[in-house]
Amino acid sequence: QSDVGIVKKTNQDSYCIFTANSKKYGNILFAVVCDGMGGLEKGELASATVVKRFSNWFEKTFPILINNISPNFGIIKSEWDKILKRLNSDIGNYGLSNNISLGTTIVATLCVQNEMYVANVGDSRVYKVTDKVTRLTNDQSLVAREISAGTLSIEDEETDSRRNVLLQCIGASQKLEPEYKKYRLEQDAVYFLCSDGFRHEIKEKELLGLLSPKIISTERSINDTLLEIINLLKERKEQDNITCVAFKTMA
């Protein structure tokens, strides 16, 4: 689900979610959320370009890849790293030649054979919901660095005036350094990817109450719940675009 929100004229977020079934590897899920830079011109172009490039990879390159070799973290990381470095260069060059600033975050997940591979640039996130809410990515932001250094408390994270300052951004970083992680997929859990607009005005305790695997039973109930959360965020005057993609693993 994605919503322009109550302030911005355009939705600079982009996302995709695909499922596939392989005889060899069973059910496969691929999802991406990108947040085009707010305040930067053409943010929606940057985020849509990244989502399209990754969608093409999943639909065209990935089937050939898994036909020849078993997918593993090293191979997927290498594939994604090449795409991200090329995108950083392409979007950066487009900005230079058109004299505009543009960029985007990304969080991408590939679930295959009970494993989840994650790529992250910027401050879009992946969470896991079981009997608690667990964040699975680290923000590449100034505020996250200050928290890590102990100069800012985690309680002040959402209210700090510098919360939108990114240390890494596709199209605007001289040297792009994506973060890659591998997780074992947990049974009977809800996973979600989101742009920062989805999380500023809601507490993790509330997300647990709404997205608990005990409550979420079908694709429809996931979509209904995400719409409910988006409407709640708009009532709370969230200023940003709001995007979230969620899925549940079965028990």
Where are these predicted regions, by residue range?
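PP2C/PPM-type serine/threonine phosphatase catalytic domain
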Residues: 1-251
